[in-house]
Amino acid sequence: MRTSGLLEQLMESLRCLPGVGPKSAQRMAFHLLQRNRQGGMQLADALSRAMSEIGHCSECRTFTEEDTCAICLNPKRQMNGELCIVESPADIVAVEATGQFSGRYFVLMGHLSPLDGIGPSDIGLDLLDHRLGRGDIKEVILATNPTVEGEATAHYIAEICQEHHVSASRIAHGVPMGGELELVDGTTLSHSILGRQKLY
């Protein structure tokens, strides 16, 4: 079936979303046009406004409509000397959902990857260096992903912390709650053994 230019453009635009291939994009486009034109208009409006009005927090670099996000403006969090380093704004949502952290964040928007040409300044480590130099951070919690790049990034940041005499800790990685050891991969199990906690 030959499709119109506008329909092709719509399907091609939908393919910019992660995990959306040609078939999924076609299904979405046809659904919006056949069954939910009102929803399509709302989606277009929300996307347009979000793209033009949402920027980055001047303190932590997460997404916000204001110059500074609500977490960074919270006086209680400002008094807490902990700074959690994450790779993306989605990681903040995950950490906040635990209810176990009451400090502030710094979002890298990625990780170090020399092979891809991503260096320290590309993920804001120059800004982090400046922020640690202000003296209001007592501990940095490194919550980068448990990947080779995430580990390398964490070690690099730990060196910056050392220069500023700021304590640096790494979140624990290991066997998930309810998991069975025989189903856990070797690398994860190795991290669990190395990061074990003393009970007595």
Swiss-Prot record:
Q: Which domain of life is it from?
A: Bacteria
SMART domains tied to this protein: TOPRIM (SM00493)
Keywords tagged on the record:
DNA damage, DNA recombination, DNA repair, Metal-binding, Zinc, Zinc-finger
Q: Which InterPro entries match?
A: DNA_Rcmb_RecR, Rcmb_RecR, Rcmb_RecR_Znf, TOPRIM_dom, TOPRIM_RecR
**Any Gene Ontology biological process:** DNA recombination
GO MF entry, a single one: DNA binding
Q: The Toprim domain covers which part of the protein?
A: 81-176
Where are the C4-type-classified zinc fingers? 57-72
Which Pfam family is an annotated match for this chain, by its short name?
A: RecR_ZnF
**Cited SUPFAM superfamilies:** Recombination protein RecR
Query: What family is reported?
Result: Belongs to the RecR family.
Described by its record, this protein's role is as follows: May play a role in DNA repair. It seems to be involved in an RecBC-independent recombinational process of DNA repair. It may act with RecF and RecO.
Name the record gives this protein: Recombination protein RecR
Source organism: Aliivibrio salmonicida (strain LFI1238)
